[in-house]
A protein has these predicted regions:
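Terminal peptide-recognition signature
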Residues: 10-12, 27, 34, 38, ...
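PDZ/PDZ-like groove recognition
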Residues: 18, 150, 202-260, 264-275, ...
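Active-site substrate-binding loop(s) of clan PA
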Residues: 63-65, 82-112, 116, 191, ...
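A conserved glycine-rich beta-strand in the N-terminal activation segment of trypsin-fold
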Residues: 1, 13-35, 50, 58-61, ...
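C-terminal cap/linker of serine protease catalytic domains
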Residues: 1, 107, 163, 167-228, ...
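Active-site region of chymotrypsin-like
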Residues: 6-8, 79-88, 117-186, 218, ...
Length: 309
């Protein structure tokens, strides 16, 4: 099975320049010219991305084609790639509880020989709350394949394969910045491949939507978190303001609470991310926030080009 699957995979490595960190994950090759399916959280926050093909061991610079944050799907392109083997795709609709599966990936982000975690399907249509430290706040992921298999950080974005070696899911594993609530050490989740490919095809066709973002990411330059449920206004709490960014120039400070963008309410950190996803670098938006002493503030902000997602 491994010999059938491995040539259609890549190891993804990211530099998170604003966080002073690095990350790693896995990708599934969709096209000989280097279109690759992975998780959004694998590339989120990246200022530089490279990928190593398991078919030829070549390291490629990576461009982001687009992403769907709500469904945790992204499509990237390996710059200069051609003639790559592609993954063999199956259908997640044929899966049943008890079916044998295996998760293949870049376990713990170490590169080298790929990891192989056998197991079986334990639930279809599962949901899990994922805490995203890079993007702030938490998100609910729905309609997932739950598996009993030892999936680890670095496996994210890699294939869940059936006994025929066909890709039936995209693994969603905990990473240093992405944590699954209530998940034991020997289980994991995957996005059904039928849904993942539908989103990937939309991204590759250049069709944006309320959930799909194409091209460069707009950026205001803040680290955010959900506001506490009690004791203050709902919104996105500013944890950090990066220097020389639109937010800093507008006067935002750590401890402020962003409450709206262009009059659209921001009730949680994810709301702010979703609104900015639909804007482009160079667009002007009107930010509304409550400052640390409780004063309402409003200012126009020109969005900059920022890290992915």
């Amino acid at each position: 099975m491994l010999s059938q699957v491995l040539p259609g995979l890549v190891d993804i490595n990211t530099t998170l320049g604003y966080q002073g960190a690095t990350g790693a994950g896995t990708g599934i090759v969709l096209d000989p010219n280097g279109d690759v399916l992975t998780n959004n959280h694998v590339i989120e926050g990246a200022t530089e991305i490279t990928a190593v093909s398991l078919a030829n061991s070549i390291t490629y610079p990576v461009d982001v084609i687009g992403f769907d944050r709500a469904n945790d799907i992204a499509v990237v392109r390996l710059r200069g790639a051609n003639g790559l083997p592609t993954a063999v795709l199956g259908s997640s609709s044929a899966l049943a509880v008890g079916d044998p599966i295996a998760a293949i990936g870049n376990s713990n982000g170490t590169g080298g020989a790929p990891s192989y975690a056998p197991g079986n399907v334990t639930q279809l249509g599962a949901s899990v709350r994922a805490s995203d430290e890079a993007g702030g706040g938490a998100r609910e992921l729905f309609d997932l394949i739950r598996v009993a298999a030892e999936i680890r950080p670095g496996d994210s974005g890699g294939p869940l394969v059936n006994s025929a070696g066909q890709v039936v899911g995209v693994t969603v594993a905990a990473t240093l910045n992405y944590h699954m609530g209530g998940v034991s050490g020997r289980e994991g989740f995957a996005i059904p491949i039928d849904r993942a490919i539908g989103i990937a095809n939309q991204i590759r066709s250049g069709a944006p939507s309320p959930s799909v973002h194409l091209g460069d990411t707009a950026f205001i330059g803040v680290g955010i978190a959900d506001a506490p449920p009690f004791g203050g206004p709902p919104g996105a709490v500013v944890r950090q303001v990066l220097p020389d960014t639109p937010a800093g120039m507008a006067g935002l400070r750590a401890g402020d609470v962003i409450t709206a963008v262009d009059g659209i309410p921001v009730n949680a950190a994810a709301d702010l991310s979703n609104i900015i996803d639909q804007r482009r670098p160079g667009n002007t938006v009107v930010l509304s926030w409550i400052d640390r002493v409780g004063n309402p503030r409003t200012a126009p902000v020109v969005l900059a080009k920022g890290p992915v997602g």
